[in-house]
């Protein structure tokens, strides 16, 4: 199985509210915001080179700054199938900066 494609890929077009994001903060159900987009990190966390603990730290939060420090734009493109959709109310600057 391809690590860059979850068992049930997301289409990346479903808007996510902050209230919904707040429901996905656990180790077994972890969504993270990067550049105004919400990603379901749940299935990928065990393969993350930095370790699965990242899910505990950033679940339900915006990890844009931290992501940018350690990842290339290529890494962001690899995550496209994990993208749930845009975060409702995310700043246009952050959302527009996405790949």
Question: Which residues are covered by each model-predicted region?
Answer:
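Histidine-anchored, small-residue-rich loop motif
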Residues: 1-99
């Amino acid at each position: 199985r391809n690590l860059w494609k979850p068992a049930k890929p997301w289409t990346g077009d479903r808007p996510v509210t902050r209230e919904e994001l707040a429901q996905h903060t656990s180790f077994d159900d972890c969504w993270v915001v990067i550049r105004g987009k919400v990603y379901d990190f749940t299935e990928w966390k065990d393969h993350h080179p930095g370790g699965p603990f990242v899910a505990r730290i950033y679940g339900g939060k915006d990890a844009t700054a931290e992501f940018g420090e350690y990842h290339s734009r290529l890494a962001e493109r690899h995550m496209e199938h994990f993208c749930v959709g845009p975060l409702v109310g995310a700043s246009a600057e952050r959302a527009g900066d996405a790949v």
